[in-house]
Amino acid sequence: MKENVASMIVFLLLLFLNIRLLKGQSPPGKPFIFKCRSPEKETFTCWWRPGADGGLPTNYTLTYHKEGETITHECPDYKTGGPNSCYFSKKHTSIWTIYIITVNATNQMGSSVSDPRYVDVTYIVEPDPPVNLTLEVKHPEDRKPYLWVKWLPPTLVDVRSGWLTLQYEIRLKPEKAAEWETHFAGQQTQFKILSLYPGQKYLVQVRCKPDHGFWSVWSPESSIQIPNDFTMKDITVWIFVAVLSTIICLIMVWAVALKGYSMVTCIFPPVPGPKIKGFDTHLLEKGKSEELLSAFGCQDFPPTADCEDLLVEFLEVDDSEDQQLMPAHSKEHSGPGMKPTDLDPDNDSGRGSCDSPSLLSEKCEEPQANPSTFHTPEVIEQPEKPKANVTHTWDPQTISLVGKMPYLSVNGSKSSTWPLLQPGQHNTNSPYHNIADMCKLATSLDKIDKDALQSSKTTEAAGEEKATKQREVESSHSKAEQDTGWLLPKEKPPFISPKPLDYVEIHKVNKDGALSLLLKQKENGDQTGKAGTPETSKEYAKVSRVMDNNILVLVQDPGAQNVALFEESTKEAPPSPSQNQAEKDLSSFSTAPSDCRLQQGGLDYLDPACFMHSLH
């Protein structure tokens, strides 16, 4: 019986425990401190969130202690901050002190403790929102209308003493808009907002934040209605500007229609014409540069020609045959009407020396004293001395050459083909003569040649007849040019040229007066082996004389003359007392025919004396 009673008691106890477990009673859950806030950095409040109560009434207690202390304190005020909060008054708040705070939950089934929270009052400041938010639309006279926003700092914050420094932020939007427009105002408590839409109702809010802390909540919304005539004045101004611009445009169109030409002339003045006297604008437009330059008195462009035809187109013909018909000894036996030729260092005709810088440099370096000259006497008189009457027998070929070729005196330096003016001569005859004068010259020279070939002896009568022929030549050239002297400048060491002596034959005369020449190789039995084809010259050439059968003898000017060769040849063949001056010159030059042709870096000219040996 006693055993049954004991088992019954155990069963009832187990049943009671199961009933209590089925009702959910347990120890409380762990609470959580989620926020601590100080509105003015003098007091602060902490809030927690409780855990599960276990089906039983639960008691919550907040305890704290300061860092470095062991004494634990309980919350001084559970009511000021609201439920589940603890308020710390100024008495219990310290700056620059760290608080270690915990929350304890206790019921009949047990207790639990929250995680500790470390709080520094300086960094948990969250002020209240600003107060007395005011909105106003202002219309200044000199500027556009704008929205004027004003507010006051929170009441609890001591801003005047500088205990806290607040910064403000404003946001606004139209009433029906979804997004806010935010403006940062800084530390000022007023702000201007521009560019508002007329007729709209705007909502405005403001908030603040300390230097170290959090933004406050937004203040309550404030609204304002923007009037419809907010931009009417601007529209009126634009309408006025448009009307005024239209009137100005109409006035300008009317003025242009009445005085269009005058206004165009005033805005775009015409280009002034040329002020030069005698200037023809038509020549400038047509592009005729020759006529335009001649109008200014300028020289025309030099003639252009193919370099292959320079020998024919720019052949220089010298028809002063009278000078070359007279032998060199006429200098010693000149008549009373003969005037001595003045010495001139150079008289460049402009044809040869322009293309020969070496000749010009040589002439500048050579001394110019005592040059030898050729003379052309006007009258040939009979010599008074008996030895001048001695007769000599010459062959016809020698007579022809004596009458046609000028000779160098033995004591002269070197022959030159540069013409010089006589003392009484003031104008220079052009080297390019008329075709009629050239024909007259060729006829007269041909006649002289034939008369010279018919004579067999040289006598006094022959000398007089020769003078008569010379006068005929002078009369044929009286219209063309005056007598020209030939200067013999001093020489420099020569360069012996291996080129053979050449002749040219007149092929035809074109309408411009230019001579077409055919090169003709010299025909001499003893010089045939040395003759060669003449090189094509791209320089100017000078004609020494015109022989029979229309053959021109080309004269080329050597760069220098070897005086030593001439003197040596003179010593080897000394002249006899009965010889005249012409025979002396002939004997001195006939000893060195191969050395007569010299060459220099400029133009290649031939000395007339060199033909004496080649024509035998």
UniProtKB/Swiss-Prot annotation:
User: The organism sits in which domain of life?
Assistant: Eukaryota
Q: Which residues lie on this side of the membrane: Cytoplasmic?
A: 259-616
The residues that hold Zn(2+) are: D211, H212
Extracellular compartment ranges equal 25-234
* Coarse class of the protein's main subcellular location: membrane
Q: Which CDD domains match?
A: FN3
Family listed: Belongs to the type I cytokine receptor family. Type 1 subfamily.
Spell out the protein name for this chain. Prolactin receptor
| Organism from which the protein derives | Oryctolagus cuniculus (Rabbit)
> Which gene codes for it?
PRLR
